[in-house]
Amino acid sequence: MLKKEQLTVESINDGISKTFSQAFRFLAHHELRKNRTFMLDLGVSILKKFLIDSRDYKVEVVQDFCSRSLTDEFKFKFTSQPIDSKSESDSASYIRNYLGPEGIKQFGGSNWWLYRKSPLKSWWIERRHHIRHNLKCDKVIFYVHGGAHYLSTVRTNAYHIQRHTAALGARTFAPDLRLAPQFPFPCSLHDVLSSYLYLLKSTKPENIIFMGDSSGAGLIVASLVLIRDSKLPLPAGVVYDSPWVDLTHSLPSVVADDAADYIPSEGFHHRASRYWPITNLDSFSTISEKELLNYSKKQELTNFIENSIRKKIQTIKNLIPVLQEMDKEHARIDFDNVDSRLDPNILTTFPFQVQFYTSNANLKHPLISPIFTENLGGLPPSLVLGGSGERLRDEIVYIAHKMNTDVYNGKRTKVRLEMYDDCCHVVTALPFVKEAGIMVRRAANFAYWCLKQHDSSFVSPNKHLDGNPSHANEDMVRLRISRNGEERLMEPKDEIQCLNLPKSALGTIQVKALIRWIDVELILLSKDTKKPARYFAEFKHADLNGYLVKPKEYTMEGENPPLSALVANCKISPEKKQ
């Protein structure tokens, strides 16, 4: 069995090996690679190898490894701040009102997502230099970390959060999020909104800048729409760093062969475990209790479930030739008009859950994939950052333009879009990368400008900022930034592929992306079907026989939590666990 200690050692060894091999490749082919920086290439290579190697480990092992603290305690002070129950309760009410009765039913109820294994807290982050010299600042960065909705913590993301804190010269307030699959949507959204409501009790909204990276930036879009529609006060400005806003992966760059990114083209995968016992938990909810009760013995139930898993694997194997034929035609799967070669109900019958964060049927919900939000107008001034080498570049460009096109109560969203040449996903997280430093400084200068619109007397402690970004008075600024920080105007909209796709393509499944995802998942499943069957059989046997101990929030009337939450957070009564 693979242990988490092995993951640490093997990752370090692989990283060292990769460092030397990449160094020699750079020296040997410098002229061929002169448009890329060595440290950027190196960082991408190490992260990509880690994400691919981590597939052979259980999701909870990788989560534990990715929760290591990377704080600089010498330069920064981290102070935990519990969030009060009133903020949590008010946040839950706003989410329920936004979802409405149908939405609440769609996501399994109005209470299960209030359950926590530990109290909600956020982190205050301050430079020790400011504390020593009593340099008080009432401006706050509200930072939401990324990690594909299932990895990382505030302290793991500390490297780039600290950089943003220092660059603006403000304090940072960053919530620790509950992670999928143990805590799927809307758990992390509730954490973000609760923390913001708490912050508003001590900080004026015009003194707050929202920042986030990747899935955290996507959460910010969803949160701001909810805040806007709930008539709550909006912050002074927003910085989105490589926002992940389309969990259907419907835009072309996701499958592009020219991506210079560490995000694998096959998506995220991990071996089965007690927290993720079978790849698509929801597909087993279709097995009736009557059918399961035919298997009174745990081993009989295990055998039945293992056979079911094997049948589902075979179903997918039979589907591959059809998908390969469709891929030759550059086809897409449109769930409103499914190709006649496929099951018309493929969205619900496809026996794999593609994202840890939510079921396949919910991927297009606007609070999960904000690119499908009907109206993104009327939001605070927004800086949208991305790299021309990342897989998510199309959705980054698309949502920036949508924000500025949509009109909400007569207002568009003022948008500044900056795409950095050759950069990968969330390049600010990579150390010693020149482009990352440029991006952090430009983000701080934009945030400074936003804050000065409400408080002209504010002076950032960072003397390198002037609070006057280029084209500041324009409603929509579209720039490409070179590796040296030089600006040039982005090409016309009609020359950008993702802005000229038919609207019907948005939210459809690219067959090439699906094939790549299936190929990796089948490899993992083929390694072992007995363990996932045993894990799930233990859970179902306990549930059917009345000795599964559930959190009280899961047992309230009308609650039907996602199975990934159930298997992770319910306990089998110890005296019955034989």
UniProtKB/Swiss-Prot annotation:
Q: Which keywords, in A-to-Z order, does the entry hold?
A: Hydrolase, Mitochondrion
**Cellular localization per UniProt:** Mitochondrion
Source species of the chain? Schizosaccharomyces pombe (strain 972 / ATCC 24843) (Fission yeast)
The UniProt entry, under Pfam families, shows: Abhydrolase_3
| Gene Ontology molecular functions | hydrolase activity
- EC number from the UniProt entry: 3.-.-.-
Family per UniProt? Belongs to the AB hydrolase superfamily.
Record's protein name: AB hydrolase superfamily protein C4A8.06c
A cellular component term from Gene Ontology for this protein is: mitochondrion
SUPFAM superfamilies tied to this protein:
alpha/beta-Hydrolases (SSF53474)
Organism superkingdom: Eukaryota
Q: Which InterPro entries match?
A: AB_hydrolase_3, AB_hydrolase_fold, GDXG_lipolytic_enzyme
